UniProtKB/Swiss-Prot annotation:
Gene3D superfamilies: Cytochrome Bc1 Complex, Chain C
Lineage: Eukaryota, Discoba, Euglenozoa, Euglenida, Spirocuta
Species in which this protein is naturally found: Euglena gracilis
Signal peptide: none
NCBIfam families, per the entry: PRK03735.1 (NF002990)
Stated family: Belongs to the cytochrome b family. PetB subfamily.
Binding residues annotated for heme b 1, in chain numbering: H100, H202
Molecular function (Gene Ontology), one example: electron transporter, transferring electrons within cytochrome b6/f complex of photosystem II activity
Domain of life: Eukaryota
Further comment found in the protein's record: Heme 1 (or BH or b566) is high-potential and absorbs at about 566 nm, and heme 2 (or BL or b562) is low-potential and absorbs at about 562 nm.
Protein name: Cytochrome b6
Keyword Transcription regulation belongs to the record: no
Binding positions (heme c): C35
PANTHER family: CYTOCHROME B
Amino acid sequence: MSRVYDWFEERLEIQAIADDVSSKYVPPHVNIFYCLGGITFTCFIIQVATGFAMTFYYRPTVTEAFLSVKYIMNEVNFGWLIRSIHRWSASMMVLMMILHVCRVYLTGGFKKPRELTWVTGIILAILTVSFGVTGYSLPWDQVGYWAVKIVTGVPEAIPLIGNFIVELLRGSVSVGQSTLTRFYSLHTFVLPLLTATFMLGHFLMIRKQGISGPL
């Protein structure tokens, strides 16, 4: 085993990377509330894992979506547990994200030179809420259907471009298969990709600039 490690160590300098990570200075004022961002990230990882597992059985069609969710809950081994963890983790992710944003704001973590870190954080907050909106519709039950109809109908009040935005979100004039397909694509591909990208940038900036000092 040591020979395998030595082979990778010689080429990648793993120990140097580990030493750099473990030796990063942590200010003395840091407390448990500074862990909220890390908890949010952990929830995201859980979401990716459980969501990926459910894609093997979920069918994004208006006729089969609800039945496939029912199948996951009642027939798939531990399917009820996987979906329940996905739902609980989603709620926890939103809660931790809100608390994290409040903590950063109240401790002045958005001030110079961390403005871009704050901006990427707000974008991540918007993406997190978008996960909730798109995921809520995927079972395509009565609650999900009417939630989508209301949410996608909100932009209609915008002058000139309102109707265009509504049709862009729904895929047609009314809510239907095109809407479910778009929300499924957003929830399982577009939003995770954007979130992972902005998280990487967010973490790199935190790593570069360090944790903000006390007020």
